[in-house]
UniProtKB/Swiss-Prot annotation:
Membrane topology summary: Single-pass type IV membrane protein
Gene3D superfamilies: 1.20.5.110, 1.20.58.70
Record SMART domains: SynN (SM00503), t_SNARE (SM00397)
Listed CDD domains: SNARE_Qa (cd15840), SynN (cd00179)
Disruption phenotype: The sgr3-1 mutant has a reduced gravitropic response in inflorescence stem but a normal gravitropic response in hypocotyls. Reduced formation of vacuolar membrane 'bulbs'.
Cytoplasmic face residues: 2-246
Source organism of the structure: Arabidopsis thaliana
Protein name per its UniProtKB record: Syntaxin-22
Subunit structure: Interacts with VTI11 and SYP51 to form a t-SNARE complex, but not with VPS45.
Topology, Vesicular side: 268
Subcellular location: Prevacuolar compartment membrane; Vacuole membrane
Length: 268
């Protein structure tokens, strides 16, 4: 099941299921679709890091997108575990088990893409500093620039004072940008760890579902073998019955001939 047909195919694949089982499968399919869309957006934002478009606003958008995807991953993982637990109950349609196993593999694939994008984001956010437009600098910057060429001595002293204020403000501003960047990097690494843990749990779940699907396949193969064997036995029984019927007819004919000969002899 590809990501392109998740939205169109999930309805057909789960419509036959009823109650909560249908809801859990649909929720997983919807979650995977949203994660895949979010990861595509996240990758485009990551590719912008280190370019002139890399601004604090872009970093903030990247941060929000990353948190949104992380929440979707947690919710979808919980729904998938719920669906998997349901699949282990008796009386569950085998088609649902197969559909859930495919969704688990799709979830695993999109998580790999998210992990790669997270790693790239961490590397680029560590390497590059966001570009800060002049309009974002402290307001005292303009005043300092105006007073750079004073006509009087008092104005020159005031200009120097303004330059010192500007320097202090700019240093404080840069420190705030650096602190915000470091905080973002820490959050990335924290989320990478969380996604890695979910990925490990998912690998166990996928393996478990693979064993379950193999059991379903073995059961189907055994049923087919038993059906084929039953047909063979029926054919053999039919042949035996036909052979017995032919032998009975032959014996009746022989008995009739013998009886006819005896009657002829007695009549003579």
């Amino acid at each position: 099941m590809s990501f392109q047909d998740l939205e169109s195919g999930r309805g057909r694949s789960t419509r036959k299921f009823n109650g909560g089982r249908q809801d859990s499968t649909q929720a997983v399919a919807s979650g995977i679709f949203q994660i895949n869309t979010g990861v595509s957006t996240f990758q485009r934002l990551v590719n912008t890091l280190g370019t002139p478009k890399d601004t604090p606003e872009l970093r903030e958008k990247l941060h929000k997108t990353r948190l949104h995807i992380g929440q979707l991953v947690k919710d979808t993982s919980a729904k998938l575990k719920e669906a998997s637990e349901t699949d282990h109950q008796s009386g569950v349609n085998p088609s649902k088990k197969i559909a859930d196993a495919k969704l688990a593999r799709d979830f695993q694939a999109v998580l790999k893409e998210f992990q790669k994008a997270q790693q790239t984001a961490a590397e680029r956010e560590t390497t590059y500093t966001p570009f800060v437009p002049q309009s974002a600098l402290p307001s005292s910057y303009t005043a300092g620039e105006v007073d750079k060429v004073p006509e009087q001595r008092a104005q020159l002293q005031e200009s120097k004072r303004q330059e010192l204020v500007l320097l202090d403000n700019e240093i404080a501003f840069n420190e705030a940008v650096i602190e915000e960047r470091e905080q973002g990097i820490q959050e990335i690494h924290q989320q990478i760890g969380e996604v890695n843990e979910i990925f490990k749990d998912l690998a166990v779940l996928v393996n478990d579902q693979g064993v379950m699907i193999d059991d379903i396949g073995t059961h189907i193969d055994n049923s087919r073998a038993a059906t084929s064997q039953g047909k063979s036995q029926l054919v053999q029984a039919a042949k035996t019955q036909k052979s017995n019927s032919s032998l009975t007819c032959l014996l009746l004919v022989i008995f009739g001939i013998v009886l006819l000969i005896v009657i002829i002899v007695l009549a003579a």
